[in-house]
Design a protein with these regions (language model features):
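Soluble periplasmic/extracytoplasmic beta-strand elements of cell-envelope proteins
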Residues: 5, 72-74, 163-165
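C-terminal lobe/tail of nucleotide-utilizing enzymes
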Residues: 153-257
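P-loop/Walker-type NTP enzyme "switch/lid" segment
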Residues: 23-98, 207-209
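Short, well-ordered alpha-helices that flank and scaffold nucleotide-derived cofactor binding pockets
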Residues: 8, 12-16, 120, 144, ...
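Amphipathic alpha-helical transducer elements in NTP-driven molecular machines
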Residues: 44, 58, 86, 90, ...
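Walker A/P-loop phosphate-binding motif and the immediately C-terminal alpha-helix
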Residues: 1-28, 96
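Residue-level signature of catalytic and energy-coupling elements of molecular machines
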Residues: 4, 50, 73, 106, ...
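Conserved catalytic-core segment of NTP-binding enzymes
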Residues: 97-98, 102, 108-194, 205
Length: 257
């Protein structure tokens, strides 16, 4: 369960609350956001087309059919990652900021061009990590880049606000010593915990059907993302899905949601 799942869920959550939101796929060459958002057949132009002046921003933006406050800007599957330029991305973000309350940048894993550009322009950063040593180590490396190579760092402005999102979390597996605990991850990364998303079959089901999991209000993962959006917007929501749940007969029979 990765960054694209989270970007789609948070963007949808913000839009469903009435905030005009754009979500941009920075993973040039792969392009998964449109699949998770269920709009892959509606892609005509993409991020690189706009940067290269082959299409306008309005031509490339896809309005979500479930929520009219949400727009998707897909990545290109065919272009090289070097097609992304600081100037080009900066212009797009500046234009979007005139009309949108929130712009969610879906950053690819690693430190390739798309990731570094998404981080460069960030005001807030959702650090999405799994409770595994390798994933947490990668996140720690990303935090170093956010602190030193962002536009805010270059200009000596207030640093990027960083929030920790812990995905695929299982209290049962933590108890067995198979994954890091919330406390372990927080101690390593020294970040404010925005939320924990439990390991859940509903995430895969949602992705396969082209629906952000936050729309599945009956699932644990959907509820967790809704809580995360609420906390980000300043609401006081108690953390859930961190402690081991005492299961009754019903939940033992039917498993996790």
């Amino acid at each position: 369960m990765g960054k694209t799942t989270t970007s789609a869920a948070i963007a949808m959550g913000l839009a469903k609350r009435g905030h005009k939101t754009a979500v941009i796929d920075f993973d040039v060459g792969l392009r998964n956001l449109d699949l998770i958002m269920g709009c892959e057949r509606r892609v005509v132009y993409d991020l690189v087309n706009v940067i290269n002046n082959e299409a306008t921003l309005n031509q490339a933006l896809i309005r979500d059919k479930r929520c009219d406050q949400l727009f998707i800007l897909p990545a290109s599957q065919t272009r090289d990652k070097d097609a992304l330029t600081t100037e080009g991305v900066g212009k797009i973000l500046e234009e979007l900021s005139k009309d949108f309350k929130y712009i969610v940048c879906d950053s690819p894993a690693g430190i390739e061009r798309g990731a570094t550009l998404a981080m460069y322009f960030a005001d807030d950063a959702f650090v999405v990590t799994n409770p595994e040593v390798s994933s947490v180590r990668d996140s720690d490396r990303m935090l170093g880049i956010l602190a030193s190579k962002s536009r805010r760092a270059e200009k000596g402005e207030e640093p990027i606000k960083e929030y920790l999102l812990l995905t695929r979390y299982s209290p049962d597996r933590v108890k067995l010593g198979e994954m890091l605990s919330v406390e372990d991850v927080q101690e390593i990364l020294s970040l404010h915990l925005l939320g924990v998303i439990p390991e859940s079959k509903s995430v895969l089901n949602a992705s396969n059907s082209g629906n952000p999991v936050i729309l599945d209000e009956q699932s644990d993962a959907g509820q967790a993302y809704a809580d995360i959006v609420a906390r980000y917007l300043g609401e006081n929501k108690p953390h859930r899905f961190i402690d081991e749940e005492k299961k009754g007969l019903f939940s033992k029979l039917f498993g996790s949601k």
